[in-house]
Amino acid sequence: MAAVLEVEIGGEAVREAAGEEVDLSELAPEERWRVEHARMHAKHRGHEAMHAEMVLILIATLVVAQLLLVQWKQRHQRSYNMVTLFQMWIVPVYFTVKLHWWRFLGIWFLFSIVTAFVTYKATRKPLVQTTPRLVYKWFLLLYKMSYATGIVGYIAVMFTLFGLNLLFRIKPEDAMDFGISLLFYGLYYGVLGRDFAEMCADYMASTIGFYSASGMPTKHLSDSVCAVCGQQIFVDVNEEGIIENTYRLSCNHVFHEFCIRGWCIVGKKQTCPYCKEKVDLKRMFSNPWERPHVMYGQLLDWLRYLVAWQPVIIGLVQGINYCLGLE
């Protein structure tokens, strides 16, 4: 029995018999998509029970994977963070090479070179005095760039949804591609930069000696020394600095502005680097224009699971479906 596939193209009905293939290369992109979409529906017609099984497998795998990841993070947080960071760094590269997204690959390569150099400097012993400020300035710059890129991408997406792109005679698909690309760049490099900054912060702070992940610090902190970078503080808390200001936490310990911003916002540390007292970020950054940076950092934490682990879980689900003969 010959199956007949009907696709509406340009107002005319195009019939594709079972032995008669339509040359997709001669069709416009939208028409080609319609033909492929109709073929997919014809292929999966009558597979409702099989599709229901696949949905149940997907839901069960997501629930089990989430429980396992939570337990792993609670019991062995260090290994969990390292594996997550590695996947965040490697997994998107596989898709970019497969889809020939050379622009993303070039930016990723440049980011990897600079970040590898900064990470190498941060993990050396003895630690050079200028290294902590170099590290925090780089990751703080990267964080602000990713934040700005994400905001521009979000605005571009919203403008497209409201049709404002037509005022500039920009096609909706071009405007949406531009916005989503910028949004992805901002979120991806924001997450990746924060994870590298957290790792470097632990190495540097423990090397300097004023901070220890577990136990007492190996050095005593004087009133005029920053516990993050170990260098002298010359600007008083009440004075306006030329390059940067000095911040005092609720525990009365003082730090350089770049250092404590890098430690708390970029490095994801919510405690004092010396005494481990809880830091109130809303109190420390009282300016309302600075608070979105804190909320943006929390958003990046939520999205880490989607970028690092979601492709792995989807791949596992596809493997299960393949073994069970589901399509």
Swiss-Prot record:
SUPFAM superfamilies: RING/U-box (SSF57850). It is found in: Endoplasmic reticulum membrane. Pathway: Protein modification; protein ubiquitination. CDD domains: RING-H2_RNF121-like. GO terms for cellular component: endoplasmic reticulum membrane. One of its GO terms (biological process) is protein ubiquitination. Its EC number is 2.3.2.27. The chain crosses the membrane at residues 50-70, 79-96, 99-119, 148-168, 173-193. Signal peptide: none annotated. It comes from the Eukaryota. InterPro entries: RNF121/RNF175, Znf_RING, Znf_RING/FYVE/PHD. GO terms for molecular function: transferase activity; zinc ion binding. The keyword Transmembrane helix applies. Keywords: Endoplasmic reticulum, Membrane, Metal-binding, Transferase, Transmembrane, Transmembrane helix, Zinc, Zinc-finger. It catalyses: S-ubiquitinyl-[E2 ubiquitin-conjugating enzyme]-L-cysteine + [acceptor protein]-L-lysine = [E2 ubiquitin-conjugating enzyme]-L-cysteine + N(6)-ubiquitinyl-[acceptor protein]-L-lysine. Belongs to the RNF121 family. E3 ubiquitin ligase which accepts ubiquitin and transfers it to substrates thereby promoting their degradation by the endoplasmic reticulum-associated degradation (ERAD) pathway which is a pathway involved in ubiquitin-dependent degradation of misfolded endoplasmic reticulum proteins. May regulate the unfolded protein response to reduce endoplasmic reticulum stress. This is E3 ubiquitin ligase Rnf121. It comes from Xenopus tropicalis. The gene is rnf121.
